[in-house]
Amino acid sequence: MSAEDYHRAIAIERRTGQRLLKGRALSAGEIAAILSVCCQDSSVKGCRDAALIAVLYGAGVRRREVVALELDDWNSVDYCLTVRRGKGDKDRTTYLDDGAAAALLAWLAVRGEHKGTIFHPLRKGGRIEMRSISDQAVLDILLERGKEAQVASFSPHDFRRTFISNLLDAGADISTVQKLAGHASPVTTARYDRRGEAAKRKAVSLLHTPYSRESTDSKQ
């Protein structure tokens, strides 16, 4: 993807002036705070919520994709998940880092080895219901945990924006990030970039202008 195409993708204009991009990326501190309140909750719910949030962020999956994940989609050897029939009815493989994988494994140890979706709703007392968690339940969990962690308002899709922004910031090429995110075009991936001015400063810091006042004076 050329620099021209990239900047065209993120330059969204309106009739008068420039429109702010929707959504935001969460900071590392915010994600840590949300996961921390889950880990401090020693109940089954705390374990499940930590795993759910870790997968949303660590795998960059959409909300409807995370509720559809099944146990057979998890590869505990390679720490990867197969996202089936994502947007565009396409399958893809996405990988978890050690932290996200540890959170998921902790939940699976509680959940058990029965077939079906990975994430289930819970009854009072932490009893697992043998059905898929709903999209709305995921939203409710995030709102609850975000409020407990005193984190500014965010949406489930902001975890996906954060996933993409952080990978780009870490130096991953946009083509690879596109595949992990399940986008049809790198232009779409670029629109998820929420790194802002800090990314521009970081990029320019990689350059070196060979200017020296001393070398200039010596030539006079």
Label for each model-derived stretch:
Residues 1-220:
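Conserved catalytic core of the tyrosine transesterase superfamily
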